[in-house]
């Protein structure tokens, strides 16, 4: 609500208040696999895709408001580890046991909450598609990697993206048409991603990463291909909930 009010009124003094609440949520309300505890300090309950989707929306919108790449990484982890995992075999969404303070491993609490979570899960998937691209003037920002096709008729941009992210090791963009205006691509590079190479039509592009993005400048022609090769390294990460007293515990991330 505060972010929406700030966007409508231009009152940016509200944004730090949202950031403070997000920090509180991450420290006490988020599970170790980026789901949610259904109540603060009630760690033996269950997770809720409704709240999970809200956290994904909020993290993305906080990034859009502040351009702090940490929020974008939060959103990426929520989508890949949670939204993509709480969707059940029939397409609906259900509740899990919250991993962290009480439960050491992931398990299903309710297979599907069709009267509630499935609806919000659908909204989350719709927003994931909406958030696949942002534009800033003639700059096309790619904050998440999705198999997709972007069309901007006002500048004759038709951009196709091919990827198995986070699986595989390549992301390919292809301009199907020559843009009417010179555009640039800003490709997200999370801190946990190893950027191995960036090429334009097979030729290396200098990959200077700033604020979590690598920039590829135009002009582009029909058929131009931008390819990003990446990898991940397995690592141990300290547990994040502040009510976990044992600081010798870690979780494996990849």
Task: Place the predicted regions along the sequence by residue.
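Glycan-recognition and catalytic cores of secretory/periplasmic carbohydrate-active enzymes
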Residues: 1-254
